[in-house]
């Protein structure tokens, strides 16, 4: 009877350890996929446009992207931020 109890306890312990290891590897895999996606977007310039204002030539505020909060700087002829 004691041997059966010990075997049962050991099996439950081993299964719980395995489940914990699976959970950690799943989190690691998701983090790796997210990091790979970010790096791929940075390298190939795919996905969302960059969230900053580029020095674009402009003649009016309509020529500038939404990230250029100051609009067109008419003195320099380029888009600018505040």
From Swiss-Prot:
Free-text comment on this protein's domains from its UniProt entry: The cysteine framework is IX (C-C-C-C-C-C).
Source organism of the structure: Gemmula speciosa (Splendid gem-turris)
Record keywords, A-Z: Disulfide bond, Gamma-carboxyglutamic acid, Hydroxylation, Secreted, Signal, Toxin
GO (cellular component) term, any one: extracellular region
Positions of post-translational 4-carboxyglutamate modification: 56
SS bond partners: 53-68, 58-72, 64-79
GO MF term (any one): toxin activity
Family note: Belongs to the Pg turripeptide superfamily.
Entry protein name: Turripeptide Gsp9.2
Sequence positions bearing 4-hydroxyproline: 49-50
Propeptide: 24-46
Chief localization: secreted
